[in-house]
């Protein structure tokens, strides 16, 4: 079984982990609703993508929910 000969210093450990950081999330403002959304994703507020309606909202009544 392989065992390290010397203790890895904090500097070496942190340099090895330097590429593991998460990148920033690119968030844009939706031109129609003004809400924040991820690029190339459907707007969660009104269901539009690229200025086209792609998802219609289903209106649930109290009878359907119960």
Curated annotation (Swiss-Prot):
- Ribosomal protein found in the keyword field: yes
Q: Name one GO biological process term.
A: translation
Q: What is this protein called?
A: Large ribosomal subunit protein bL32
What is the gene called?
rpmF
* Family indicated by similarity: Belongs to the bacterial ribosomal protein bL32 family.
A Pfam family matched by this chain, by name?
Ribosomal_L32p
Source taxon at top rank = Bacteria
As one GO molecular function, the record gives: structural constituent of ribosome
Matching SUPFAM superfamilies: Zn-binding ribosomal proteins (SSF57829)
Its keywords, alphabetically, are:
Ribonucleoprotein, Ribosomal protein
GO cellular component terms listed in the entry, alphabetical order? large ribosomal subunit
The record's section on PANTHER family has: 50S RIBOSOMAL PROTEIN L32 (PTHR35534), LARGE RIBOSOMAL SUBUNIT PROTEIN BL32 (PTHR35534:SF1)
